[in-house]
């Protein structure tokens, strides 16, 4: 059984765009034999999204017009529930934080994930 690896990128910081590049590059180099990758994009407005469409960098040129291609998610506050969607939950075993700047490099997201 593969490990579910959530890769977090984007965010509200001024380094939002470079975080997208970092996240996509990290995903590209993950060993897909060992991990099922769950891309998790944090939009500029703070909403969280997941879906395979996030793997295409072109999606981010006009995300607002394209966001119907992905699902909005939120982090459960119940330990072990992972990410919640309108149609169930997504189990997360490991998180890779590829966010730069505010809420990424300051440990805020890490702290939030540790509480979940």
Regions found by a protein language model. Name each.
Residues 1-116:
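ATP-binding N-terminal substructure of ATP-dependent carboxylate-amine bond-forming enzymes
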């Amino acid at each position: 059984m593969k490990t579910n690896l959530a890769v977090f990128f984007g965010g509200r910081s001024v380094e939002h765009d470079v975080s997208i590049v970092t996240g996509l590059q990290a995903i590209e180099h993950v060993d897909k034999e060992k991990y099922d990758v769950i891309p998790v994009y944090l939009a500029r407005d703070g909403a969280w999204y997941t879906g395979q469409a996030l793997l295409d960098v072109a999606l981010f040129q006009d995300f607002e017009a394209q966001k119907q291609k992905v699902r909005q998610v939120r982090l459960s506050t119940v330990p072990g529930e992972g990410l919640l969607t309108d149609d169930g939950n997504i189990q997360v075993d490991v998180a890779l934080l590829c966010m730069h700047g505010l809420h990424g490099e300051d440990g805020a997201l890490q702290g939030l994930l540790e509480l979940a």
